[in-house]
Amino acid sequence: MYYNHKNVLDTEQFSKPDLDFLIGKIRVMERLVEQNKAFGILTGKLLASLFFEASTRTRLSFEAAMERLGGRVISTVGFQFSSISKGETLYDTMKMVEAYADIAVIRHPVEGSSRIAAGAVKIPVINAGDGAGQHPTQAILDLYTIISEKGTLDGLKVAFIGDLKYGRTIHSLINLLRHYKVRLFLISPPELALPESYKKALQGYSLTLEETTDIKAVWDCDVAYVTRIQEERFPDHKEYERLKDLFKINKELILASKKETTVLHPLPRVNELSTDVDDLPNAAYFRQARYGVVSRMTLLCLSLGQDF
Protein backbone atom coordinates (compact mmCIF):
# COMPACT_ATOMS: atom_id res chain seq x y z
CA MET A 1 0.00 0.00 0.00
CA TYR A 2 0.95 3.67 -0.23
CA TYR A 3 1.90 4.91 3.26
CA ASN A 4 2.32 8.67 3.35
CA HIS A 5 2.92 9.91 6.89
CA LYS A 6 6.15 11.85 7.15
CA ASN A 7 5.01 13.41 10.42
CA VAL A 8 3.44 11.49 13.30
CA LEU A 9 1.41 14.09 15.19
CA ASP A 10 -1.81 12.42 16.33
CA THR A 11 -3.77 9.21 15.95
CA GLU A 12 -6.55 10.69 13.84
CA GLN A 13 -4.17 10.72 10.89
CA PHE A 14 -4.10 6.91 10.65
CA SER A 15 -6.67 4.88 8.71
CA LYS A 16 -7.31 1.16 9.22
CA PRO A 17 -5.12 0.30 6.17
CA ASP A 18 -2.37 2.48 7.66
CA LEU A 19 -2.56 0.55 10.92
CA ASP A 20 -2.54 -2.83 9.17
CA PHE A 21 0.54 -1.71 7.26
CA LEU A 22 2.26 -0.44 10.41
CA ILE A 23 1.59 -3.62 12.40
CA GLY A 24 3.05 -5.68 9.56
CA LYS A 25 6.15 -3.48 9.32
CA ILE A 26 6.71 -3.61 13.09
CA ARG A 27 6.63 -7.42 12.87
CA VAL A 28 9.26 -7.25 10.12
CA MET A 29 11.40 -4.91 12.23
CA GLU A 30 11.08 -7.22 15.24
CA ARG A 31 12.42 -10.11 13.15
CA LEU A 32 15.29 -7.96 11.83
CA VAL A 33 16.26 -7.04 15.39
CA GLU A 34 16.14 -10.69 16.48
CA GLN A 35 18.43 -11.55 13.54
CA ASN A 36 20.76 -8.58 14.22
CA LYS A 37 19.99 -7.19 10.76
CA ALA A 38 18.50 -3.79 11.68
CA PHE A 39 21.74 -1.93 12.39
CA GLY A 40 22.78 0.29 9.51
CA ILE A 41 19.33 1.03 8.07
CA LEU A 42 19.62 4.68 9.18
CA THR A 43 23.40 5.10 9.08
CA GLY A 44 24.25 8.74 8.49
CA LYS A 45 20.92 10.05 9.82
CA LEU A 46 20.67 12.32 12.87
CA LEU A 47 17.75 12.46 15.31
CA ALA A 48 17.04 15.58 17.38
CA SER A 49 15.52 14.40 20.67
CA LEU A 50 13.67 17.40 22.15
CA PHE A 51 12.10 16.66 25.52
CA PHE A 52 10.75 19.74 27.26
CA GLU A 53 8.75 17.62 29.71
CA ALA A 54 9.83 14.74 31.93
CA SER A 55 10.29 11.36 30.24
CA THR A 56 12.26 8.17 30.78
CA ARG A 57 10.80 5.40 28.61
CA THR A 58 9.78 7.45 25.57
CA ARG A 59 13.01 9.43 25.36
CA LEU A 60 15.28 6.44 25.95
CA SER A 61 13.33 4.18 23.60
CA PHE A 62 13.48 6.72 20.76
CA GLU A 63 17.19 7.26 21.31
CA ALA A 64 17.79 3.51 21.57
CA ALA A 65 15.73 3.00 18.41
CA MET A 66 17.86 5.46 16.46
CA GLU A 67 21.12 3.99 17.77
CA ARG A 68 19.98 0.43 16.97
CA LEU A 69 19.33 1.54 13.39
CA GLY A 70 22.84 2.94 13.07
CA GLY A 71 21.83 6.59 13.34
CA ARG A 72 22.96 9.18 15.86
CA VAL A 73 21.19 11.39 18.40
CA ILE A 74 21.49 14.98 19.59
CA SER A 75 19.26 16.01 22.47
CA THR A 76 17.97 18.62 24.85
CA VAL A 77 16.10 17.85 28.06
CA GLY A 78 13.99 20.40 29.94
CA PHE A 79 13.26 24.07 29.30
CA GLN A 80 16.03 25.15 31.64
CA PHE A 81 18.68 23.64 29.38
CA SER A 82 17.38 25.18 26.15
CA SER A 83 17.13 28.68 24.71
CA ILE A 84 13.38 28.55 25.31
CA SER A 85 14.28 29.49 28.90
CA LYS A 86 15.71 32.71 27.43
CA GLY A 87 12.49 33.51 25.63
CA GLU A 88 13.08 31.79 22.30
CA THR A 89 9.89 30.61 20.59
CA LEU A 90 9.29 26.98 19.71
CA TYR A 91 9.14 28.06 16.06
CA ASP A 92 12.66 29.51 16.21
CA THR A 93 13.96 26.50 18.12
CA MET A 94 12.65 24.19 15.42
CA LYS A 95 14.20 26.27 12.63
CA MET A 96 17.57 25.79 14.32
CA VAL A 97 16.95 22.07 14.81
CA GLU A 98 16.16 21.74 11.11
CA ALA A 99 19.67 22.95 10.32
CA TYR A 100 21.21 20.21 12.47
CA ALA A 101 19.06 17.08 12.19
CA ASP A 102 17.23 14.87 9.69
CA ILE A 103 14.25 14.18 11.96
CA ALA A 104 12.93 15.51 15.29
CA VAL A 105 11.05 13.90 18.15
CA ILE A 106 9.40 16.38 20.51
CA ARG A 107 7.67 16.22 23.89
CA HIS A 108 6.18 19.47 25.15
CA PRO A 109 3.72 20.37 27.94
CA VAL A 110 1.49 22.47 25.66
CA GLU A 111 -1.26 20.65 23.77
CA GLY A 112 -0.88 21.18 20.02
CA SER A 113 2.82 22.04 20.24
CA SER A 114 3.86 19.25 17.89
CA ARG A 115 1.80 20.84 15.10
CA ILE A 116 3.54 24.16 15.67
CA ALA A 117 6.88 22.34 15.51
CA ALA A 118 5.97 20.47 12.32
CA GLY A 119 4.68 23.65 10.71
CA ALA A 120 8.01 25.35 11.22
CA VAL A 121 10.22 22.83 9.41
CA LYS A 122 10.50 20.53 6.41
CA ILE A 123 12.12 17.64 8.30
CA PRO A 124 9.83 14.95 9.78
CA VAL A 125 8.46 15.62 13.27
CA ILE A 126 7.18 12.96 15.66
CA ASN A 127 4.98 13.86 18.61
CA ALA A 128 6.25 12.18 21.79
CA GLY A 129 3.48 13.70 23.92
CA ASP A 130 1.92 17.16 23.96
CA GLY A 131 0.45 18.01 27.35
CA ALA A 132 -2.90 16.35 27.94
CA GLY A 133 -3.34 15.98 24.17
CA GLN A 134 -1.95 12.90 22.45
CA HIS A 135 0.89 10.39 22.45
CA PRO A 136 0.55 8.66 19.05
CA THR A 137 3.67 6.49 19.14
CA GLN A 138 2.61 5.07 22.51
CA ALA A 139 -0.79 4.21 21.02
CA ILE A 140 0.83 2.42 18.09
CA LEU A 141 3.05 0.34 20.35
CA ASP A 142 0.06 -0.36 22.63
CA LEU A 143 -1.92 -1.57 19.64
CA TYR A 144 0.97 -3.81 18.62
CA THR A 145 1.26 -5.11 22.19
CA ILE A 146 -2.40 -6.11 22.37
CA ILE A 147 -2.25 -7.88 19.01
CA SER A 148 0.99 -9.64 19.99
CA GLU A 149 -0.40 -10.75 23.36
CA LYS A 150 -3.93 -11.65 22.24
CA GLY A 151 -3.46 -12.53 18.57
CA THR A 152 -6.25 -10.17 17.49
CA LEU A 153 -8.19 -7.08 18.46
CA ASP A 154 -11.62 -7.77 17.03
CA GLY A 155 -14.04 -9.10 19.62
CA LEU A 156 -11.96 -8.07 22.63
CA LYS A 157 -13.23 -6.30 25.73
CA VAL A 158 -10.75 -3.59 26.72
CA ALA A 159 -10.92 -1.73 30.03
CA PHE A 160 -9.32 1.69 30.53
CA ILE A 161 -8.76 2.41 34.20
CA GLY A 162 -7.77 5.59 36.02
CA ASP A 163 -7.26 9.06 34.63
CA LEU A 164 -9.28 9.15 31.42
CA LYS A 165 -9.52 12.94 31.46
CA TYR A 166 -5.85 13.87 31.32
CA GLY A 167 -4.33 10.57 30.18
CA ARG A 168 -3.00 11.25 26.67
CA THR A 169 -2.04 7.60 26.17
CA ILE A 170 -5.70 6.66 26.61
CA HIS A 171 -6.90 9.43 24.29
CA SER A 172 -4.53 8.22 21.59
CA LEU A 173 -5.20 4.49 21.91
CA ILE A 174 -8.98 4.93 21.93
CA ASN A 175 -8.70 6.82 18.65
CA LEU A 176 -6.94 3.82 17.10
CA LEU A 177 -9.30 1.23 18.60
CA ARG A 178 -12.28 2.82 16.84
CA HIS A 179 -11.09 1.01 13.70
CA TYR A 180 -11.69 -2.39 15.36
CA LYS A 181 -14.71 -4.31 16.66
CA VAL A 182 -13.96 -3.95 20.35
CA ARG A 183 -15.97 -3.25 23.50
CA LEU A 184 -14.52 -0.47 25.63
CA PHE A 185 -15.10 -0.23 29.37
CA LEU A 186 -14.19 3.17 30.83
CA ILE A 187 -13.52 2.79 34.55
CA SER A 188 -12.87 6.04 36.41
CA PRO A 189 -14.30 8.48 38.93
CA PRO A 190 -16.75 10.91 37.26
CA GLU A 191 -14.25 13.76 37.73
CA LEU A 192 -11.73 11.95 35.52
CA ALA A 193 -14.10 10.65 32.84
CA LEU A 194 -13.13 10.58 29.19
CA PRO A 195 -13.75 14.03 27.61
CA GLU A 196 -16.91 14.28 25.52
CA SER A 197 -14.91 15.20 22.41
CA TYR A 198 -13.31 11.74 22.38
CA LYS A 199 -16.65 10.00 22.92
CA LYS A 200 -18.19 11.89 20.01
CA ALA A 201 -15.26 10.91 17.79
CA LEU A 202 -16.18 7.24 18.35
CA GLN A 203 -19.71 7.63 17.00
CA GLY A 204 -20.38 5.82 13.76
CA TYR A 205 -17.73 3.14 14.35
CA SER A 206 -18.29 -0.53 15.15
CA LEU A 207 -16.97 -0.45 18.72
CA THR A 208 -19.18 -0.09 21.79
CA LEU A 209 -18.50 1.94 24.91
CA GLU A 210 -19.60 1.55 28.53
CA GLU A 211 -18.75 3.80 31.48
CA THR A 212 -18.65 2.65 35.10
CA THR A 213 -17.12 3.46 38.47
CA ASP A 214 -16.98 -0.23 39.44
CA ILE A 215 -13.41 -1.56 39.30
CA LYS A 216 -14.77 -5.13 39.26
CA ALA A 217 -15.89 -4.55 35.66
CA VAL A 218 -12.33 -5.54 34.77
CA TRP A 219 -13.21 -9.15 35.64
CA ASP A 220 -15.04 -9.54 32.34
CA CYS A 221 -12.35 -7.90 30.19
CA ASP A 222 -9.61 -9.35 28.00
CA VAL A 223 -7.30 -6.36 28.49
CA ALA A 224 -6.92 -3.94 31.41
CA TYR A 225 -5.11 -0.73 30.45
CA VAL A 226 -4.15 0.97 33.71
CA THR A 227 -2.88 4.54 34.02
CA ARG A 228 -1.64 6.68 36.87
CA ILE A 229 -3.54 9.75 38.00
CA GLN A 230 -1.75 12.65 36.26
CA GLU A 231 -0.75 14.77 39.26
CA GLU A 232 1.04 17.35 37.09
CA ARG A 233 -2.18 18.14 35.16
CA PHE A 234 -4.32 18.99 38.20
CA PRO A 235 -4.93 22.70 38.84
CA ASP A 236 -5.98 21.83 42.41
CA HIS A 237 -3.61 19.53 44.33
CA LYS A 238 -6.29 18.75 46.93
CA GLU A 239 -8.43 17.29 44.16
CA TYR A 240 -5.53 15.04 43.15
CA GLU A 241 -5.06 13.83 46.72
CA ARG A 242 -8.77 13.01 46.94
CA LEU A 243 -8.81 10.97 43.74
CA LYS A 244 -5.39 9.33 43.52
CA ASP A 245 -6.15 6.19 45.54
CA LEU A 246 -9.67 5.41 44.34
CA PHE A 247 -8.71 2.78 41.75
CA LYS A 248 -6.00 0.22 42.45
CA ILE A 249 -5.14 -2.93 40.53
CA ASN A 250 -3.59 -5.75 42.51
CA LYS A 251 -2.95 -9.46 42.15
CA GLU A 252 -6.12 -10.47 44.00
CA LEU A 253 -8.30 -8.43 41.64
CA ILE A 254 -6.66 -9.82 38.49
CA LEU A 255 -6.76 -13.44 39.70
CA ALA A 256 -10.51 -13.06 40.32
CA SER A 257 -11.07 -12.23 36.65
CA LYS A 258 -13.26 -14.56 34.61
CA LYS A 259 -10.69 -14.33 31.83
CA GLU A 260 -6.91 -14.24 31.70
CA THR A 261 -6.93 -10.46 31.67
CA THR A 262 -3.79 -9.01 30.10
CA VAL A 263 -2.58 -6.06 32.17
CA LEU A 264 -1.01 -3.10 30.35
CA HIS A 265 0.37 0.16 31.73
CA PRO A 266 2.26 2.87 29.80
CA LEU A 267 4.36 3.55 32.93
CA PRO A 268 5.52 5.16 35.14
CA ARG A 269 3.26 3.78 37.83
CA VAL A 270 2.75 5.23 41.28
CA ASN A 271 0.41 3.19 43.49
CA GLU A 272 -2.43 2.40 41.06
CA LEU A 273 -0.77 -0.87 39.98
CA SER A 274 0.62 -3.08 42.72
CA THR A 275 4.00 -4.76 42.25
CA ASP A 276 2.40 -8.07 43.26
CA VAL A 277 0.93 -8.19 39.73
CA ASP A 278 4.42 -8.25 38.21
CA ASP A 279 4.96 -11.99 38.52
CA LEU A 280 1.70 -12.91 36.77
CA PRO A 281 2.18 -14.25 33.21
CA ASN A 282 -0.51 -11.88 31.96
CA ALA A 283 1.32 -8.82 33.31
CA ALA A 284 2.50 -7.45 29.96
CA TYR A 285 3.66 -3.91 30.78
CA PHE A 286 7.38 -4.65 30.70
CA ARG A 287 6.96 -6.50 27.40
CA GLN A 288 4.93 -3.48 26.30
CA ALA A 289 7.99 -1.27 26.95
CA ARG A 290 10.19 -3.60 24.86
CA TYR A 291 7.72 -3.44 21.98
CA GLY A 292 8.18 0.33 22.15
CA VAL A 293 11.69 0.17 20.75
CA VAL A 294 10.84 -1.84 17.62
CA SER A 295 7.69 0.23 17.08
CA ARG A 296 9.68 3.46 17.18
CA MET A 297 12.43 1.99 15.01
CA THR A 298 9.73 1.33 12.43
CA LEU A 299 8.25 4.82 12.67
CA LEU A 300 11.67 6.49 12.38
CA CYS A 301 12.40 4.55 9.19
CA LEU A 302 9.01 5.25 7.62
CA SER A 303 9.10 8.96 8.49
CA LEU A 304 12.50 9.21 6.83
CA GLY A 305 11.27 7.32 3.76
CA GLN A 306 13.60 4.41 4.42
CA ASP A 307 11.99 1.06 3.67
CA PHE A 308 13.29 -2.21 5.12
Curated annotation (Swiss-Prot):
Matching SUPFAM superfamilies: Aspartate/ornithine carbamoyltransferase (SSF53671)
Sorted UniProt keywords: Pyrimidine biosynthesis, Transferase
S-S pairs: none
GO biological process: 'de novo' pyrimidine nucleobase biosynthetic process; 'de novo' UMP biosynthetic process; amino acid metabolic process
Any GO molecular function: aspartate carbamoyltransferase activity
EC number(s) given by UniProt: 2.1.3.2
Enzyme class: transferase
Xref: Pfam families: OTCace, OTCace_N
Residues binding carbamoyl phosphate, per UniProt: R57, T58, R107, H135, Q138, L267, P268
Residues that hold L-aspartate according to the record: K86, R168, R228
UniProt cross-references to InterPro entries, sorted A to Z: Asp/Orn_carbamoyltranf_P-bd, Asp/Orn_carbamoylTrfase, Asp/Orn_carbamoylTrfase_sf, Asp_carbamoyltransf, Asp_carbamoyltransf_Asp/Orn-bd
Pathway(s) annotated for this protein in UniProt: Pyrimidine metabolism; UMP biosynthesis via de novo pathway; (S)-dihydroorotate from bicarbonate: step 2/3
Reaction(s) this enzyme catalyzes, per UniProt: carbamoyl phosphate + L-aspartate = N-carbamoyl-L-aspartate + phosphate + H(+)
Functional note: Catalyzes the condensation of carbamoyl phosphate and aspartate to form carbamoyl aspartate and inorganic phosphate, the committed step in the de novo pyrimidine nucleotide biosynthesis pathway.
NCBIfam families the record matches: asp_carb_tr (TIGR00670), PRK00856.1 (NF002032)
The protein's assembly and partners: Heterododecamer (2C3:3R2) of six catalytic PyrB chains organized as two trimers (C3), and six regulatory PyrI chains organized as three dimers (R2).
Family: Belongs to the aspartate/ornithine carbamoyltransferase superfamily. ATCase family.
Name this protein carries in UniProt: Aspartate carbamoyltransferase catalytic subunit
Source species of the chain: Leptospira interrogans serogroup Icterohaemorrhagiae serovar copenhageni (strain Fiocruz L1-130)
Source species taxonomy: Bacteria, Pseudomonadati, Spirochaetota, Spirochaetia, Leptospirales
